[in-house]
């Protein structure tokens, strides 16, 4: 089933995007900063911002998602 129609899969994709964008922004900040004001690519910069500012909550959500994946 597509991740668009399954809420659990959609949440997992969003969490993975946030974690990946935060990692990329931490390693190569200029890569995402140059597209900060771009309409489409600016979304990746925003996801990195969410991952940096809400990192304890994002980490907890990733841990809970991993536990739920192991249980299913």
UniProtKB/Swiss-Prot annotation:
Its main location: endoplasmic reticulum. Residues 1-26 form the signal peptide. Disulfide bonds: none annotated. Disruption phenotype: Inviable. GO terms for biological process: intracellular transport; protein secretion. The chain crosses the membrane at residues 54-72. The keyword Endoplasmic reticulum applies. It is found in: Endoplasmic reticulum membrane; Golgi apparatus membrane. Residues 27-53 are lumenal. It is a single-pass type I membrane protein. Keywords: Endoplasmic reticulum, Golgi apparatus, Membrane, Signal, Transmembrane, Transmembrane helix. 'Kish' means small in Hungarian. Belongs to the KISH family. Involved in the early part of the secretory pathway. This is Protein Kish. It comes from Saccharomyces cerevisiae (strain ATCC 204508 / S288c) (Baker's yeast). The lineage of its organism: Eukaryota, Fungi, Dikarya, Ascomycota, Saccharomycotina.
